[in-house]
Amino acid sequence: MAKNKFNQSWLHDHINDPYVKLAQREGYRARAAYKLKEIDEQDKLIKPGQVIVDLGAAPGSWSQYVRNKLAASPRAKDGRIDGAIVAIDILPMEAIADVTFIQGDFREDEVFRQLEEIVLEVSGGGKVDLVLSDMAPNLSGVASADAARMEHIAELAVEFAMAHLKPEGALLIKCFHGSGYSQIVEMFKRHFKIVAPRKPKASRDKSSETFLLGRQLKHPG
């Protein structure tokens, strides 16, 4: 009975969520697009001509938002974007124009090599301007185990960023307040000159979800 009430409450909140309605109206696959939009408007992350990698991309709303931004550039011609987008997820994702998508597990060496090869090809040198990560582990409800999983995913995103970001590039990841959060912040501070937490309005108040932004590598690769 309690589970039923929880499901009904979630469904009611979801149906009446203004960001869900806005996403449906504007053609985004998920309300998550507005989390990135708000952070981008505050921090000016996405600019014409950039090479951007979207980790944990499915169902694709972040890639959709990035694509729309790059398509709006005055230099974008013949319906193409001014820049390049590479997206990856373990789950399938319906195709998005101008987005190169890899379905596979980011943690597997073969998939990781494929990602690196595509990044090298689209960037002309292997360096990217922005890495986005909306990756999150399957949570078990055991705080210590979930914290370890979240920290591991954050480490993977940071390792990729350290190897592939331009010196002035940026990394934005999703994480959660609670056990392990301070360790992720400290990891960011070791690698980035500027570190800033972000809690966009589209991120539900009840959720411990937050985002962490790192800019300008301290030790460029």
From Swiss-Prot:
Subcellular localization is given as:
Cytoplasm
Cellular component, GO annotation: cytoplasm
What reactions does this protein catalyze? Answer: uridine(2552) in 23S rRNA + S-adenosyl-L-methionine = 2'-O-methyluridine(2552) in 23S rRNA + S-adenosyl-L-homocysteine + H(+)
Active site location: 174 (proton acceptor)
Q: Read off the SUPFAM superfamilies from this record.
A: S-adenosyl-L-methionine-dependent methyltransferases
* Keyword Membrane set for record: no
Keywords linked to the UniProt accession: Cytoplasm, Methyltransferase, rRNA processing, S-adenosyl-L-methionine, Transferase
Q: Is the S-adenosyl-L-methionine keyword given for this protein?
A: yes
Q: What is its EC number?
A: 2.1.1.166
Annotated region Disordered: the residues are: 199-221
Name the principal localization, coarsely classed. cytoplasm
Q: Where does S-adenosyl-L-methionine bind?
A: 60, 62, 89, 105, 134
The entry lists its GO molecular-function terms as: rRNA (uridine-2'-O-)-methyltransferase activity
Q: Which domain of life is it from?
A: Bacteria
What HAMAP family does the entry give?
RNA_methyltr_E
Q: Which family is annotated?
A: Belongs to the class I-like SAM-binding methyltransferase superfamily. RNA methyltransferase RlmE family.
Checking PANTHER family in the record gives: RIBOSOMAL RNA METHYLTRANSFERASE, RRNA METHYLTRANSFERASE 2, MITOCHONDRIAL
Task: Relate the protein's function as given in its record.
Answer: Specifically methylates the uridine in position 2552 of 23S rRNA at the 2'-O position of the ribose in the fully assembled 50S ribosomal subunit.
Task: Please report the name of this protein according to its UniProt entry.
Answer: Ribosomal RNA large subunit methyltransferase E
Please give the organism: Ralstonia pickettii (strain 12J)
Q: What is the lineage of its organism?
A: Bacteria, Pseudomonadati, Pseudomonadota, Betaproteobacteria, Burkholderiales
